[in-house]
């Protein structure tokens, strides 16, 4: 079991870029003192049961950190409004305990408003339109997920290209592989969903190789004790298909971190 120290996560004096895997598609980032959360699902279903997740599935390991222990965040980025990304217990805790700005699509924003978040703390994600939050730049990227597959519907899901402390981090979100994705370059860290309802093994490796990302962390697997299609993935199979995986590809335990130097 790996735990995340809330003081380290929220350290204003941090000089590096530290990225923790929260499980699922979720990540916590401290970029030289700036705190970013992506798709955090970090509250239990009930306070007394640390391995019963808030979305109703048992966890393989206890939560590495809880939302109620986080008292500072600059931005919360939500790729879409499914419960394993926009979490029913985590989001209200973060709304109440932090002053974070929430970046999401209009569909997800409706969920946030229903949770009591005021419009001054919501920034609507539009593909390709860069948002500034302090000294960070966040650019939503195109995504197509599940009900959008095979249709012309766009805009309910997104990824995020983040530039913070001189480091570029890309989380494509839950998406099938799209032509636009293959044109993304100059990525320092790729947060790579590998579950079969997202990129899956072959397309995840294809994207990793196309971007030439300097570092890659697989996600969206190995979190819930379930064989549901969106809970499983094979990080070793993905790694076997990635060029120079020994130096680029980092398979983390839930709660484990990767540290990159800030520019």
Say what each PLM segment does.
Residues 40-42, 81, 143-145, 173-175, ...:
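Active-site metal-binding loops of divalent metal-dependent hydrolases
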Residues 6-9, 34-77, 88-93, 148-149, ...:
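Pre-active-site segment of Zn-dependent metallo-hydrolases
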Residues 1-58, 233-236, 240-245, 256:
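Zn-dependent metallo-beta-lactamase
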Residues 34-36, 74-75, 101, 136, ...:
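Structural motif
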Residues 101, 116-132, 205, 209-263:
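Binuclear metal-ion centers of metallo-dependent hydrolases, dominated by the metallo-beta-lactamase
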Residues 89, 145-211:
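Active-site-proximal loop/helix segments of hydrolase catalytic cores
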């Amino acid at each position: 079991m790996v735990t995340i120290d809330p003081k380290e996560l929220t350290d204003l004096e941090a000089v590096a870029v530290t990225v923790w895997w929260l499980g699922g598609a979720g990540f916590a980032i401290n970029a030289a003192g700036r705190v970013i959360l992506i798709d955090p699902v970090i509250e239990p279903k009930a306070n007394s049961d640390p391995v019963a997740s808030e979305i109703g599935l048992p966890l393989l390991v206890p939560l590495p950190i809880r939302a109620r222990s986080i008292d500072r965040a600059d931005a919360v980025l939500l790729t879409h409004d499914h419960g394993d990304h926009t979490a029913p217990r985590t989001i209200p805790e973060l709304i109440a305990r932090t002053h974070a700005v929430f970046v999401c699509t209009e569909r997800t924003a409706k969920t946030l408003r229903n949770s009591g978040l005021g419009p001054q703390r919501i920034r609507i994600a539009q593909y390709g339109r860069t948002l500034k939050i302090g000294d960070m730049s966040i650019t939503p990227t195109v995504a197509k997920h599940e009900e959008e597959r095979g249709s012309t519907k766009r805009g309910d899901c997104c990824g995020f290209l983040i530039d913070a402390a001189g480091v570029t981090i890309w989380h494509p979100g839950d998406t099938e592989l799209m032509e636009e994705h293959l044109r993304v370059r100059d990525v320092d860290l790729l947060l790579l969903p590998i579950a079969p309802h997202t990129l899956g093994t072959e397309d995840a490796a294809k994207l990793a190789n196309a971007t030439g990302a300097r570092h890659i962390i697989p996600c969206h697997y190995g979190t819930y004790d379930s064989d549901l299609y969106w809970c499983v993935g094979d990080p070793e199979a993905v790694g076997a298909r990635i060029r120079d995986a020994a130096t680029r590809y980092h398979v983390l335990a839930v709660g484990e971190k990767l540290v990159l130097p800030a520019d």
